[in-house]
Each structure stands twice: as structure tokens, then as C-alpha cells.
Regions:
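Composition- and surface-driven signal marking solvent-exposed, interaction-prone regions
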Residues: 226-228, 233-234, 260-262, 311-316
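A short acidic/basic microdomain associated with nuclease active sites
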Residues: 215-239
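Interfaces and regulatory segments of ATP-dependent nucleotide/adenylate/phosphodiester-chemistry enzymes
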Residues: 2-219, 312-402
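Catalytic cores of nucleic-acid endonucleases
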Residues: 251-301
Length: 402
């Protein structure tokens, strides 16, 4: 750890005027590494994109157990923006993905490649509308407060000279497909000055999804929502044979400026404050309330999709080094954990035992994902069968050519 700190300080002394690195301790270095690895880990394995797509589709459209009364029907939004319903939009987006796998300029492709039916929705006009929505100009990029990170939401650039829409990166296009439904709604609300309404409503929908998962994998007597009291508490209580898990749910996402090679430290600090530091006392209060014979694990459950939680934990040592029973878990981690509980109880018990007896220390933290991986308890476990929306949409896409 000391070597990493010294290398960073040496680089900073030669190349940077940043005061942050001049005074960085090991926790600060991990904070910087969190931003760097967040971006790199996403690029190294795109399997997460299918899971994210299915989860977003399930919460915003697919599940009958999610209360969507506080949000606008997403089909209304896609019709207003593109003249398409959601499934038609997704079919068009799949075609754009395929076209871009052949050529980075999809609008130059012959319409004969994709429009093979008089009643089909995959038309040149539809593709132009969707590509146009996800495009920016050079000027947009230059003036963007988040710089090149704008390509995460707008993965096409429209050239000045030829007015051609060119894909910046296939990885970024795939990422846009994965999270596109969520950001389509969130951006629509923001553009109409209703941004906080969607964020608040989605937080409640995230709770609905947690309860749906609990109903799917657990006995009804194993879990409950902790009643709101004068003393702030965690959100949910879940009991197993060998442990109690307390969950504090956080649907807020890490700012895009924090997810890059030179991360915005202020955005990281804001995310930590809102989603971890302020919520820690709530988990502690509930731990005191439910203290008994069984050991307790305190879980910050994030909707944020990330595979570098061990680095985030190492960057907040006051909590995750000093409190051995505290973890950050992504919603995908929870899906795999609960599926393992139902499918392989012995494997599940080993995971819980390891989490209860962790030996986190400065510079070394084990995440829930790492422990799940150690016991071969990872994979596409939840979004299968009727919940495999990606395959279902893909079949509809194929039908356009039959």
C-alpha cells in the first residue's frame, strides 16, 4: 500500500498541481482508484449490460409488482420522442447495435439491410430519430461540463464537415443500451424540470423490487420492512439460520464525472455522504435494536452497478475496516445471494460464514461479490426464463426478418 501511495505522490510532484494528491493518504488513494477502476472494469466485461437491461426493463415495464403510479408511462415518452412504443424502440436499437458492429456510421447503411417488411417498425426514419437522439456535435462535447463522459449517454458524434453520425465506441453504445430505459426517463423528467420527482419515485420502486425479490426467494416470516420510528433505522430486516441481515436501500447513482481515469473527487465524496456515511447511523441503530444470539450483517444496498466494491470499502476505512460486519452490496449481488440461498443452501451458508468472519484490514477488503465468486455463486441467476427480457426482445427483433 505504501508503494502505491509513494508512486502517486511521485507522479503528482512531477506532473500535477493537485493539492488532493499531495496530501493523499491510503484511503484517498483508494478513492482515486475507485474512479479509475469503475471505468476500466466496465469495459473489461460487458456481461453486466444484459443484466442491467433486464433489471431496468423489469422495474420500469415488466414486473406487475412494481408500483409505477408516480411516474409517466415510459411508452408515452418513447412515443413522444420517437413515435414508437418501448418494444419497438428496443428493436430499432438492436438493429443499430448490429449495424454499428459492421460500420461505425449506421445511417450510411442501405435500408434494404433492415427494412424488409411494409409494416415493419425498423425503418430509415426510425433509425435516424434514435441515432439523432443519441448524438452530439463537436461543440456539444467542447462545452459539456463532463467532457468526454458525455459519450456515456450520447455515443454518437455528428461531424461538422459531412454531418455524418459516427459511433464513438461500441462499448459505449452497448452501455447506453443497458441503461437506456432508465436514463431515457430520468432525462425526460430533468428536461421538463421534474427531475427530483423521478428520483424520489424510483427510490420507492427500488423498495418494491427488493420486496419482490424477498417474496420470490424467502419465506414470508424471514423478512419485514422495519417500521418508521422517531429514531432513524434501516429499511429491511432479513433473517437466516445463521445470521440477520439489515439492509439500507440507496437508489442514487454515482455521478458520471466520478467514473473516469481522473475522477471528480467531490462527486465521489457526495455519493459517499448521501449513500453510505449518513446511512451508517441508521444501520447501527437497527443493529442495537435487533442484537441477540445471531450475528448481524449491516448492508448498504445500492442500485448502482459496479464490480469494484472492495476498493470503495477500502476508501472508507472508518466504517469498513473498523466495523467488520458492514458491507456494500449491489442489487445484482443480492439477486445472486438470494438465488444461491434457494438453489444451494450449503454454498449459501459458506458465503454467510465468510462474510461474518471477514478479516478486512487497511488496504485489503473483501467485497460480497468476491466472496460469492470464491464459492462459485455468481452468474445469471435471476433474469432467466420469463424474466430474460433481453432474449425475448431479441426474438421479436429476429421476427422482423421472417
Amino acid at each position: 500500500m505504501g508503494m502505491i501511495v509513494n508512486l502517486y505522490r511521485g507522479y503528482e510532484n512531477e506532473h500535477s498541481k493537485s493539492e488532493f494528491l499531495k496530501n493523499a493518504d491510503s484511503a484517498d488513494i483508494f478513492k482515486i482508484m475507485m474512479g479509475m477502476t469503475y471505468e476500466q472494469f466496465k469495459y473489461q466485461n460487458l456481461a453486466w449490460t444484459i443484466q442491467n437491461f433486464c433489471r431496468n426493463y423489469h422495474i420500469l415495464i415488466g414486473s406487475p409488482n412494481i408500483n409505477r403510479e408516480k411516474i409517466i408511462d415510459i411508452n408515452q415518452i418513447t412515443d413522444e420522442l420517437f413515435g414508437l412504443n418501448v418494444d419497438e424502440l428496443l428493436a430499432v436499437e438492436m438493429m443499430i447495435l448490429w449495424l454499428c458492429s459492421q460500420n461505425p456510421s449506421p445511417l450510411t447503411a442501405s435500408e434494404k439491410l433492415y427494412n424488409r417488411s411494409e409494416t415493419g417498425v425498423i425503418t430509415k426514419e426510425a433509425i435516424e430519430k434514435v441515432v439523432g437522439y443519441y448524438s452530439v456535435t463537436y461543440k456539444d462535447v467542447r462545452n459539456s461540463p463532463i467532457g468526454k463522459q458525455i459519450f456515456y449517454s450520447k455515443p454518437f458524434v455528428k461531424t461538422d464537415k459531412t454531418q455524418e453520425n459516427i459511433m464513438v465506441s461500441f462499448y459505449l453504445l452497448a452501455m447506453t443500451f443497458a441503461d437506456g430505459l432508465y436514463w431515457l426517463m430520468r432525462d425526460y423528467y430533468r428536461n421538463n424540470n421534474w427531475g427530483q420527482k423521478f428520483i424520489n419515485a424510483f427510490g420507492e420502486m427500488f423498495e418494491d423490487y427488493f420486496e419482490e425479490l424477498a417474496d420470490t426467494y424467502l419465506d414470508e416470516k424471514q423478512w419485514f420492512k422495519i417500521p418508521v420510528q422517531n429514531k432513524k433505522s434501516a429499511d429491511y430486516y432479513v433473517e437466516f439460520d445463521n445470521a440477520i441481515l439489515l439492509f439500507e436501500l440507496k437508489s442514487g447513482l454515482l455521478g458520471i464525472g466520478a467514473k473516469q481515469q481522473v475522477p471528480d473527487i467531490q462527486q465521489i465524496d457526495t455519493f459517499y455522504k448521501r449513500n453510505i456515511l449518513e446511512a451508517y447511523e441508521q444501520l447501527k441503530n437497527s443493529e442495537e435494536e435487533f442484537q441477540g444470539e445471531k450475528q448481524i450483517l449491516k448492508i448498504f444496498l445500492l442500485y448502482e452497478s459496479a464490480t469494484n466494491m472492495q476498493i470503495i470499502m477500502a476508501s472508507i476505512p472508518d466504517i469498513f475496516i473498523n466495523d467488520k460486519g458492514c458491507y456494500i452490496m449491489t442489487i445484482e449481488d443480492l439477486e445472486m445471494l438470494l438465488a444461491t440461498y434457494r438453489n444451494d443452501r450449503e454454498k449459501f451458508n459458506k458465503v454467510i460464514y465468510t462474510l461474518l468472519n471477514n478479516e478486512n484490514s487497511e488496504g485489503r477488503c473483501e467485497s460480497v461479490l468476491k466472496v460469492l465468486g470464491d464459492y462459485d455463486a455468481i452468474g445469471d441467476m435471476h433474469f432467466i426464463g420469463e424474466r430474460d427480457y433481453y432474449t425475448n426482445i431479441l426474438e421479436r427483433f429476429k421476427n422482423c426478418f421472417r
